[in-house]
Structure formats: structure tokens, C-alpha cells
UniProtKB/Swiss-Prot annotation:
It catalyses: 1-(5-phospho-beta-D-ribosyl)-5-[(5-phospho-beta-D-ribosylamino)methylideneamino]imidazole-4-carboxamide = 5-[(5-phospho-1-deoxy-D-ribulos-1-ylimino)methylamino]-1-(5-phospho-beta-D-ribosyl)imidazole-4-carboxamide. The keyword Isomerase applies. GO terms for molecular function: 1-(5-phosphoribosyl)-5-[(5-phosphoribosylamino)methylideneamino]imidazole-4-carboxamide isomerase activity. This is 1-(5-phosphoribosyl)-5-[(5-phosphoribosylamino)methylideneamino] imidazole-4-carboxamide isomerase. The active site is at D8 (proton acceptor), D130 (proton donor). It holds the Pfam family His_biosynth. GO terms for biological process: L-histidine biosynthetic process; L-tryptophan biosynthetic process. GO terms for cellular component: cytoplasm. It is found in: Cytoplasm.
Length: 241
């Protein structure tokens, strides 16, 4: 299980939201590329980068920060937020993004999902399944899709998706701990390589996730707020798992 530090970009700053609420955001840095450099020095290998403006269809706002992060860090980068057409995929491929995260498009545009798989391969395509009360949220978590996350996962498995990020929005940004039951059910029911996201607050949370009794082990865990608030030491976490 790998530990994946997160940077969420809003207006070119690193921020964290509380339960996905844009009105409850806290700014942690106006130089997010420096955060990425620090994560690399502490032993991370993969960065989870989210364009929050892009997720709300406010395109291009964080472009400079995304480019600078890509140019200044040795980390592999998986990027999501607003990837809803072939042109955006091609652009991110051109600037060296390693993995593309599709969220809204995975629900609303199965043709784009197939295009991404066919042209970039299963290892580079990740689907974000973001849910609250069992229902998938889209468009920056501001709209209900009307689709239950288990139904979406059934579709993704049939489409050949191998990698997903599952976020329990009710836990995200709360430091209240992960939804262990949900991850256990998913890992026992589907063939995905699953990355957990939402609620991580301590090394104990990571240990609890890594020790889940499941058919497939958890692939990785995303953590953001716990790092920024000093609740979790990245180097220690990486060496302990």
C-alpha cells in the first residue's frame, strides 16, 4: 500500500475543502510546487493533484501551477478535475502528466472513457468514484448523478477499468477517519486496484486500512489535510507501511 500526498488547487493555491464544500476551504500554500518538492524529499513517489476550478468547469485557472508542479517535481503525477474531452487528455499527456483521473466524464461520457483506455492504456486511466450516502456526485461534487456507486463500479468493471479512487465525501477533509466498511466491501466485490481517499487523520488510520482482510489489498491511500495540519508525518508513514 502506497501513501499518496494530495494537492488540491483552487485559484493557484493549495487548499483543502471540508466535505467537498467550496465555501469551507482553507488555503495552505500559494506556492503548491514547493509542497510537491517537500513530499518528494520525504519519500513519496506519486502525487495526487486536483484542479478544483476545473472540476467546476472553470478551465485554465490553475494551468500555470500545474505546469510548474510538473516541471519542478520528480514525483509521478495523477491529475483530475475537469478532464472531460480528448483535447484536455492530449494536453495533459503532452506536458507529462502520468495518470489521468476521470470523474464526471466516467459517469456521463462512456465514449470518452473508452477513448482514454484505448489511447493511453489501463495503467494511466484512473476513475474517481466520489460518493455520499451511496450516490455518486459529479461536477466538483456539486451535482448528484443519480447513480449508486455500486452500479457505477459494475459498469467500470465491464469497461475494463483497473484503477479507481474511492472517496467517501462525508469523510473528506474531516480528519474523522476513513470509511473502513466501504473499502472492505469494494475490495471484496471488485477486481480494481483501489486508492482510498477521505478522512485520514493519523498513522493508525493508515494501519487500519493496510490491515483490512480483503481479497485484494488496498493499492494506496491519499492524504492531504492530515499532512498540512501536522497530524501525520509523511516520511514516518511511508516507512511504517
Amino acid at each position: 500500500m502506497i501513501i499518496i500526498p494530495a494537492i488540491d488547487l483552487f485559484d493557484n493555491c493549495a487548499v483543502r475543502l471540508f466535505k467537498g464544500n467550496y465555501k469551507e476551504k482553507k488555503i495552505y500554500s500559494s506556492e503548491p510546487w514547493k509542497l510537491a518538492e517537500g513530499f518528494a524529499k520525504n519519500g513519496a513517489t506519486l502525487l495526487h493533484l486536483v484542479d478544483l476550478n476545473g472540476a467546476r468547469n472553470q478551465l485554465g485557472i490553475n494551468e500555470d501551477s500545474i505546469l510548474k508542479i510538473r516541471k519542478t517535481t520528480s514525483l509521478k503525477v495523477q491529475l483530475g478535475g475537469g478532464i472531460r474531452d480528448k483535447e484536455k487528455l492530449a494536453y495533459y499527456d503532452k506536458i507529462g502528466i502520468d495518470r489521468f483521473i476521470l470523474g464526471t466524464a466516467a459517469v456521463t461520457d462512456p465514449d470518452l472513457l473508452k477513448f482514454a483506455l484505448d489511447n493511453y492504456g489501463k495503467e494511466r486511466v484512473v476513475v474517481a468514484v466520489d460518493a455520499i450516502d451511496g450516490i455518486v456526485k459529479i461536477a466538483g461534487w456539486e451535482k448528484d448523478s443519480g447513480v449508486r456507486y455500486r452500479d457505477l463500479m459494475d459498469r467500470l468493471a465491464k469497461a475494463g477499468i483497473e484503477h479507481i479512487v474511492f472517496t467517501d465525501i462525508a469523510q473528506d477533509g474531516t480528519l474523522a477517519g476513513p470509511n473502513l466498511k466501504a473499502y472492505q466491501e469494494i475490495l471484496n466485490s471488485y477486481p480494481f486496484q483501489v486508492i482510498a481517499s477521505g478522512g485520514i487523520s493519523s498513522l493508525k488510520d493508515l494501519m487500519d486500512l493496510s490491515s483490512l482482510k480483503t481479497k485484494i489489498p488496498l493499492y494506496g491511500v491519499i492524504t492531504g489535510k492530515a499532512l498540512y495540519e501536522g497530524k501525520l508525518d509523511l516520511a514516518k508513514a511511508i516507512s511504517s507501511i
